[in-house]
Amino acid sequence: MEPFRIHKGTAAVLMNDNIDTDQIIPKQYLKRIERTGFGKFLFDEWRYDNNRQENPNFPLNAPDRKGASILITGDNFGCGSSREHAPWALADYGFRVIIAGGFADIFYMNCMKNGMLPIVMDKEMREKLVKTDAREQIEVDLENEVITTSTHRFHFTIEKMWKEKLLNGLDEISITMQYEQEIKEYERRVAVY
């Protein structure tokens, strides 16, 4: 996993509450286990019309929001079933940071495990953040837990364990591999039955 320290990018805004994983990526696209190729199905039923043409009224389709790597959204983002395909679709689309009023627990952990930073931020702060010009680069500094725009500085908090994993680009496997020698030594000492 790529370390996450400071990210600069533009933001897309989708301030709906209770966006569930089936709205993030509908179930018909979950037939693969590769982590890539899901971005084109992100928010599929909202992004496209019945002819698979982009819906011009959907916020992510706005020309000035294309290429955004920060998503600002409502409360309880990622609720519903605990499919890991939802964070895969967000990451494959290009999002590195998701700022919401809250997240479903499993979705929150799956974001972290896939190198995305989910940030919990109250509504008043998010409303200030969404007023940022669509072309402005927003800086997200994980190490100092600060989001900076040209007019505001917002502080956020993150659990130390998750922060360290993201800062160092570590997932469960890479953490386990840090103890490879100890594991081999243990296996050598323990009798086989």
Curated annotation (Swiss-Prot):
One of its GO terms (molecular function) is 3-isopropylmalate dehydratase activity. It holds the Pfam family Aconitase_C. The keyword Amino-acid biosynthesis applies. CDD domains: IPMI_Swivel. Its EC number is 4.2.1.33. It is an enzyme of class 4 (lyase). Heterodimer of LeuC and LeuD. Belongs to the LeuD family. LeuD type 1 subfamily. This is 3-isopropylmalate dehydratase small subunit. The lineage of its organism: Bacteria, Bacillati, Bacillota, Bacilli, Bacillales. The gene is leuD.
